Design a protein with these regions (language model features):
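C-terminal accessory "lid"/substrate-recognition subdomains
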Residues: 2-5, 161-224
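Nucleotide-state-sensitive switch-loop elements of NTP-binding domains
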Residues: 2-170
């Protein structure tokens, strides 16, 4: 049975962003193992990158029948898959049995286009996601141990063979800043791997990037 549109507007959406290796998947596993009975729909770019903890499946904490795991293929969620994202979110919302939607962006995704998807009316597809759900949180996971190395590298994504295609001229530093600036929650991960001086300077840097964010520190290898 489908919920009416009034009910469907209550479906909150969280987008998880962060550069490759920052800890997005570990955070996702943590959310799934602490969902407090909520039914969560997960949308990802590449299911092979997500690697949902097998223990969650064995313990019944996650299953493809109880929750929805949707894979978007052949591109970066921020650039080439907006149409796919629109269709999948609408489909999940209309099914009426989802409490929360979590979108894990690709490590090379910029958050802004993903966020715009939830305020964008696609007249060609006839989809208006504001009728079904609301974007509540933009989370960016930052690898505190590698951030400054990546930021100061001067490399392009293509230099690391991480570009979407051969024409992807994006700079890694610019991508990192985009992911930080367009978020309202920053999770500073692997904080245990850096010294106190670096820790304080990193925290000050992220806090000064914008005045809107909640900044949390964590060591995702242990407990968030």
């Amino acid at each position: 049975m489908r919920k009416d549109e009034t009910d469907m507007t209550n479906i909150p959406v969280t987008v998880i962003s962060g550069y490759l290796g920052s800890g997005k998947t570990t955070l996702l596993n943590h959310l799934l193992s602490n969902r407090q009975g909520k039914k969560i729909a997960v949308i990802v770019n590449d299911m092979s990158e997500v690697n949902i903890d097998s223990a969650l499946i064995q313990q019944g904490g996650f299953s493809r029948t109880e929750e929805k795991l949707v894979e978007l293929q052949n591109g970066c969620i921020c650039c080439t898959l907006r149409e796919d994202l629109l269709i999948e979110v609408e489909k999940l919302a209309q099914e009426g049995n989802i409490d929360f939607i979590v979108i894990e962006s690709s490590g090379i995704s910029e958050p802004i286009p993903v966020a715009h998807t939830f305020s964008y009316v696609d007249e060609e597809l006839g989809i208006d996601l504001t009728k079904f759900c609301r974007l509540v949180t933009m989370v960016t996971v930052v690898d505190a141990n590698r951030f400054w190395h990546d930021y100061a590298s001067g490399e392009l994504l293509l230099d690391r063979q991480q570009g979407i295609n051969d024409n992807d001229s994006r700079d890694i530093a610019d991508l990192l800043i985009d992911q930080i600036e367009f978020s309202n929650v920053i999770l500073l991960n692997k904080i245990d791997l850096i010294g106190e001086t670096d820790r304080l300077s990193s925290i000050n840097f992220y806090k000064n990037s914008t005045q809107k964010q909640t900044l949390s520190t964590a060591a995702l290898a242990g407990l968030i």
